[in-house]
Regions:
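Short cysteine/histidine-rich metal-coordination sites, predominantly Zn2+-binding motifs
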Residues: 161-170
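Short, well-structured hydrophobic secondary-structure segments
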Residues: 37-83
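Intrinsic, low-complexity N-terminal interaction/targeting segments
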Residues: 1-26, 68-123
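Short, structured motif recognition centered on aromatic/hydrophobic residues
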Residues: 24-30, 50, 54, 103-107, ...
Length: 170
């Protein structure tokens, strides 16, 4: 990727949804020590898959979460009004540096090798990974509940369940 911004180690990474259930957009917000920020827009399924991948890494690395004491709690980060980088994700890769106990994310807004593709690389420690995984779970679960029969999201205005009515739309 010729247009890649390396954020290095992050001081903060979080996941959030913007909008009402059924109309939500999902994003990761990242901030490094130089106050550079990134917003990575992604699909709900991508966010959920990232959370599962982080959970797998933490399990494989045998990470044991130690909650912060009240004295160690970090203040809420202040993000710049305009992010340094803002992209709609097309590709998201994750790696692990076991020596430094960091998770590495590589994100791009287009296919690898394209001249116009923009991307970011960033890394965060296992503690931030644990907290991000917990946050992703809450964000994803806060949407429309799945239908118990077909697992499609249930719309508050009504839900047509293909398993209940016996046919799928054409």
């Amino acid at each position: 990727m010729p247009n890649t911004h390396d954020f290095g180690p992050l001081v903060h990474i979080s996941a959030e949804a913007v909008g009402n259930p059924g109309q939500r957009r999902f994003r990761l917000r990242a901030l490094n020590s130089a106050s550079e920020s990134a917003i990575l827009w992604l699909e709900k399924e991508q966010l959920s898959a990232l959370g599962e991948a982080i959970e797998s890494v933490l399990s494989a690395e045998e990470y044991v979460h130690q909650p912060l004491t009240a004295d160690d709690t970090e203040p809420e980060p202040v993000f710049p009004l305009r992010p340094t980088v803002e992209i709609q994700l097309v590709q998201l890769s994750m790696g692990v540096n076991s020596e430094s106990r960091r998770i590495v994310l590589i994100a791009a807004d287009g296919p690898q090798g394209e001249d116009e593709t923009h991307g970011v690389t960033m890394e965060f420690d296992y503690r931030n990974g644990f907290e991000l995984r917990s946050q992703i779970s809450r964000v994803v679960a806060a949407g429309r509940p799945p239908c118990p029969l077909c697992t499609a999201p249930m719309d508050p205005a009504g839900h047509v369940c293909v398993k209940k009515n016996g046919h799928q739309p054409h």
